[in-house]
A protein has these predicted regions:
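Metal-coordinating catalytic core of metallo-dependent amide/deamination hydrolases
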Residues: 1-94
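Glycine-enriched alpha-helix->loop->beta-strand junction motifs that scaffold or abut catalytic
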Residues: 46-52, 84-87, 104-113, 134-139, ...
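Short, electropositive alpha-helical surface patch
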Residues: 38-48, 105-116, 267-275
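Catalytic core of soluble alpha/beta enzymes
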Residues: 59-83, 87-89, 94-110, 118-131, ...
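Thr-Gly-centered strand-to-loop micro-motif
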Residues: 91-93, 114-117, 141-143, 243, ...
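His/Asp/Glu-enriched, well-ordered alpha-helical/loop segment
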Residues: 81-88, 130-215, 232
Length: 284
């Protein structure tokens, strides 16, 4: 555990000392059910009071059961007790929060990231995103490492809640847009304050993609979410600019050797799988 704490502290310190860095960090916890009270206190004490955390919360009911059995507190109450919540902390999932936990996230201005495809894949349930947003929680759209195809996450979020509630009026396209564009940009701006993110204005970070998309019907600000959800695919992105630097042109990566990276990944994957299977065997 202490090696993990040192790694977090080292990475956070490195990004904080470089004002031009395009990477920022929060302290990476796993989940309440894998952390003792002593571990939470040690993690909190290892960094400054304005350092945020990211942590899986109530992804499955077992996380809540574990917290109640160990401490008598639900997950969010427990994290709050140990100083983990706050405006620079990101909680993931929140599938099984109760009303008090939702209110506590609002009161502490803690962020929540919604991962619809991951939750579907793990069969853990559906986060009550709409009621959370109405309550004032700043809900972002993430992917839990499921893949980097974020437009697929838009589509999953849009459809999942309709199917879950058996109501086509649920999860409006504007709600998906609010999470994926405006709230995600607002979260990024918490960590990158040198220039605005998510806006095309003078002085902002020049983060731009070019999309080879030719709509068959008019595209306006009013119907943009549905063009993204039903019309656009990640393969249509032809160029990517980050902070004014061209990283991909004509679908070719300019700063990375894709073939070399893929070959290296295939080379080391079996050893990673082997270590994982060995650890699983210890607890089975």
């Amino acid at each position: 555990m202490r090696a993990g704490i040192r790694e977090n502290v080292r990475f956070i310190s490195k990004t904080q000392t470089d004002s031009s860095a395009l990477v920022a960090g929060t302290f990476g916890l796993h989940a309440s059910l894998t952390l003792s009270d002593a571990s939470l206190d040690e993690c909190r004490a290892a960094v400054s009071s304005d350092t945020g955390f990211h942590v899986h919360t109530a992804e499955h009911e077992s996380d809540e059961y574990d917290s109640l059995n160990k401490t008598g507190l639900r997950v969010i109450d427990r994290l709050h007790k140990h100083g983990i919540l706050g405006p620079r902390t990101i909680t993931a999932h929140g599938v099984h929060f109760d009303a008090r936990e939702i209110q506590l996230l609002c009161d502490t201005e803690t962020w929540l990231s919604h991962q619809p495809r991951s939750n579907m894949n793990n069969g853990v349930g559906v986060t009550p995103v709409e009621s959370m947003m109405r309550a004032g929680i700043r809900v972002c759209l993430g992917n839990d490492g499921f893949s980097n195809a974020m437009w697929e996450e838009w589509k999953a979020a849009y459809l999942l809640h309709k199917a879950h509630h058996r109501d086509p009026r649920r999860m409006h396209g504007y709600d998906v847009q609010q999470m994926a564009i405006y709230n995600n940009a607002a979260l990024a701006n918490v960590f990158f304050q040198n220039a605005p993110i998510g806006r095309l204005i003078p002085g902002a970070f020049a983060d731009i993609i070019f999309v080879d998309y030719h709509p068959n019907t008019p595209m306006t600000a009013g119907n943009l979410p549905w063009h993204i959800i039903f019309g656009m695919q990640q393969s249509m992105v032809t160029a990517t600019i980050v902070a004014g630097k061209l990283l991909m042109k004509d679908r070719q990566l300019l700063t990375l050797d894709e073939e070399e990276i893929s070959a290296k990944a295939r080379e080391i994957a079996p050893s990673v799988w082997g270590r994982y299977q060995a650890e699983v065997a210890k607890i089975m």
